[in-house]
């Protein structure tokens, strides 16, 4: 009887241990299943591995109007005008196709075969919104997409008068500072919730949202930033030399083409306030804003860049000032 009791006790203990082991495994599996992937980290890894355009010498992808003019008969160039239908009707580049920004992905996937072209050129009013959506298309994997420098403002003077020529100013030039501000400490990451687990699928969802959002929602006026610098995290997207010679108060300098990667300074961008980016023209920074918006940062582009508040300084130093010398008198289709 004693031996039987010992045997039964042994079997009972073995069963308890075995059951506990299964329970632990089940709990681990349950916890593993219930823990969703960090979508920001998955997306960032995917972009830096496959679509790292913004941190490469290829950015920004600006094309001069002269090259577009020279290739109007070139079937390897596809020109897309993203302005409103009324402005397109008023005057557009020969052979251009009018496509609204929200329809660009559909146009690329269903209306054309992008790989058949050497260059696909987006055109807008000033070059800024075209740069933004070209940036999104680059992120989507279309490496032959460019934006026309200065937009239609460089094509004919009446377009320039409605855009660039009335938006350059030196009114705030006396308020720039030369103080060197340190980057913020690394903090929290953006929260992305697409419900997807793979980088490509997350990117697709983010791109669809970005194309559906009007570019105007990313525009910030320089006057507002000067008036309320504490409201924003201000990035001066110029080289250190230009930064040292004058920038928006409280702006922090970030190196173009290299600083916004996980191995550099990307994680210093805050998630509790809007990040606004300033460059010479607003075009180069529009590409950056597109990238950061896709990653989940709340990002704004200072309209017309430094041309909007220290135009004379840019002109005197040959730092990318827009002038009438940038305006051509090329023909349009009306």
Can you annotate each of these PLM segments?
Residues 147-176, 303-322:
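Cysteine-dependent PTP/DSP-like catalytic domain, specifically the C-terminal lobe
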Residues 237-238, 242-245, 249-255, 260-261:
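Eukaryotic modular interaction domains in large regulatory/scaffold proteins
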Residues 58-77, 82-112, 117, 121, ...:
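Post-signal peptide N-terminal segment of secreted/secretory-pathway proteins
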Residues 9-17:
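Bacterial N-terminal signal peptides
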Residues 13, 22-78, 85-90, 160-242, ...:
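Flexible, polar/low-complexity N-terminal or interdomain linker segments that lie immediately upstream
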Residues 57, 252-254, 309-330:
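Surface-exposed intrinsically disordered loops and tails
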Residues 108-155, 254, 262-312:
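Catalytic cysteine-centered active loop of the rhodanese-like fold, especially the PTP/DSP P-loop
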Residues 1-4:
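Positively charged n-region of N-terminal signal peptides that target proteins for export
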């Amino acid at each position: 009887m004693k031996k039987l009791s010992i045997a039964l006790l042994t079997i009972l203990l073995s069963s308890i241990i075995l059951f506990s082991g299964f329970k632990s495994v089940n709990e681990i599996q349950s916890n593993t299943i219930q823990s969703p992937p960090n979508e920001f980290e998955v997306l960032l890894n995917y972009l830096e591995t496959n679509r790292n355009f913004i941190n490469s010498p290829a950015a920004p992808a600006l094309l001069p109007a002269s090259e577009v003019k020279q290739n109007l008969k070139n079937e390897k160039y596809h020109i897309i005008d993203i302005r409103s239908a009324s402005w397109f009707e008023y005057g557009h580049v020969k052979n251009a196709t009018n496509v609204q920004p929200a329809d660009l992905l559909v146009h690329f996937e269903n209306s054309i075969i992008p790989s058949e072209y050497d260059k696909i050129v987006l055109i807008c009013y000033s070059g800024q919104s075209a740069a933004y959506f070209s940036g999104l298309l680059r992120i989507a994997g279309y490496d032959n997409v460019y934006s026309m420098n200065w937009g239609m403002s460089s094509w004919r003077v009446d377009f320039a008068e409605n855009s660039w020529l009335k938006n350059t100013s030196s009114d705030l030039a006396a308020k720039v500072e030369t103080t060197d501000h340190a980057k913020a400490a690394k903090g929290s990451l953006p929260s992305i919730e697409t419900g997807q687990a793979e980088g490509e699928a997350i990117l697709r969802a983010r791109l669809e949202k970005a194309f559906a959002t009007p570019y105007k929602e990313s525009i910030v006026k320089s006057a507002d930033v000067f008036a309320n610098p504490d409201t924003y995290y201000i990035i001066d997207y110029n080289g250190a030399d230009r930064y040292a010679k004058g920038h928006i108060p409280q702006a922090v300098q970030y190196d173009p083409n290299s600083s916004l990667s996980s191995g550099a300074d990307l994680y210093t961008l805050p998630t509790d306030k809007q990040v606004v980016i300033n460059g010479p023209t607003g075009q180069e920074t529009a590409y950056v804003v597109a990238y950061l918006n896709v990653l989940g940062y709340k990002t704004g582009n200072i309209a017309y860049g430094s041309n909007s508040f220290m135009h004379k300084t840019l002109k005197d130093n040959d730092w990318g000032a827009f002038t009438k010398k940038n305006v051509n008198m090329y023909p349009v289709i009306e």
